[in-house]
Amino acid sequence: MTPTPIPIPAAATAPLPTAATAPPPPPAARATDWTAWHLHLGTTARSAHDRVVTDVIGPTIRELAPGTPWFFIRYWQSGPHLRLRVGDLDTAARARVEAALTERLAAAGAPAPGEEPLDPAAYRSGAERLAAAGETGENTSVKALLPPGVHPAAYEPEFDRYGGRALMPAAESLFTLSSDLVLAALPRVGSERQRAVLALRGTVAVAAALGDPADRAYYYAHGLGAWRAWAAEAGHPAELLDTITRVEGAVTLDPGSHGPFAGWHARIAAHADEIREQSPTHPGMVLFSHAHMLHNRLGLSLLEELRTYAVLAHAFPVPEGTPVPASAPVPASTPAPRNV
């Protein structure tokens, strides 16, 4: 199920699609009453999943009141699908959203020419690989395929992953911002190179919230090691991983220039301060998951995310003689979303 990675050019300076400017965070984050749907497709084709984001989820969200919280992710369990969460809907609004999703998915979700229909055997093989690569709980086993369509679901926040219950509303506001950015960017992504560069620049914007250059360098180095380990657990051969992580020549990146991710960086940096004040968790542990979910929303694979960290670890190596941080800046277990 994991596509071949797209190499990121050394000079990662291609123009980025314009994305939404981040609004200021709410004065006080509060708990949201979430309604969830899983939008299942009969193909793993990235183009089909992009189409569901732009032609199904996007128009449905735009019909809601301005400022309605929402977010989406892409996932594999029970078959390829997008998980949509919308906040604070009353009963009538829930019914309208579900009806709109159902109507639009019926039109946009069918595989287009060149989008291969899902092979159940291939799903099981790929899902078994993903389940074995560091998953926990119910996702260590492969669930039966669900048919294409809109399936009501439950949202279970991952409190531990995002720094604790008190920090979850702030994390969810970042889910909304990340989803808004990707929804704005996808129609303007004309190549896989642009998609990869978006993920690269978004990750730089995240790392810049961690502090000095040494902190960022350790974040990239640990991220590279973690993703390589998870890729190996998923069954990818060492020779392939060597190829993906090989970066030659100079990489031109300005770590302080965030372009369309300027608002994203500002909100991430503010959240890093919240984590330092309210949680014993290293901010990098939480921000690593936010960077991963940006990759996920952009539709990038495990191997493509590994490539992101290979490029950044090459561009910003750990300075010689730098003390090892007291706590790891990235998690030791898989960052893949589970219940979100």
Locate predicted features.
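An acidic, charge-biased composition feature
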Residues: M1-V340
